[in-house]
Amino acid sequence: MADKYTPRLKGKYDAEIAAAMQAKFGYKNALEIPRIEKITLNMGVGEASQDKKKVTTAAAEMELIAGQKPVITKAKKSIAQFKLREGMPIGCKVTLRRERMYEFLDRLITIAMPRIRDFRGLNPKSFDGRGNYAMGLKEQIIFPEISYDQIEKVRGMDIIVTTTAKTDDEARELLRLFGFPFPQDAAEQQQAA
């Protein structure tokens, strides 16, 4: 019988990251060690109030990026200034867990982030205080699944990484060990030199 497939980052977490986190923060129980719970991708399509087809094309692009069919989000309230009615489609979102989450994370860190123009690392202040990290991308074409010739408009998206960490410091260390490119603090840079 063939061995079950394990994503690269899941194997890295089990082999290295969990032990490093336990050594640094001194967890007594293995279930206390923080892990990534889910990754949520959200794409708001502002021009969807005029043309409903824009949401379906955005959803198709997100499906290529995530490898999972997104849910179309609808407006909760009517807003006259935006010509928006309650129930109109205004975007799409997808929640990734388990293997798909680790595979997306691997593609994000190793392929997509290096393709961002003028990229100097992620903002270390984007944690929410409960160990979750939110980041925004300005263009979806950094993902290799999206062909530049076939897109109709460059769109951005929000990526929220939800962890089981209790504090931002634990979550920052967890994501750093996964390979998230946070710029080093000035004090850490002096120690490394």
Swiss-Prot record:
PANTHER family linked to this entry: 60S RIBOSOMAL PROTEIN L11-RELATED
InterPro entries documented for this protein: Ribosomal_uL5, Ribosomal_uL5_bac-type, Ribosomal_uL5_C, Ribosomal_uL5_CS, Ribosomal_uL5_dom_sf, Ribosomal_uL5_N
Keywords: Ribonucleoprotein, Ribosomal protein, RNA-binding, rRNA-binding, tRNA-binding
Name assigned to this protein: Large ribosomal subunit protein uL5
Keyword Protease: no
GO cellular component: ribonucleoprotein complex; ribosome
Domain of life: Bacteria
GO molecular function: rRNA binding; structural constituent of ribosome; tRNA binding
Entry-linked SUPFAM superfamilies: RL5-like
The UniProt record lists the keyword Ribosomal protein: yes
Gene name linked to the record: rplE
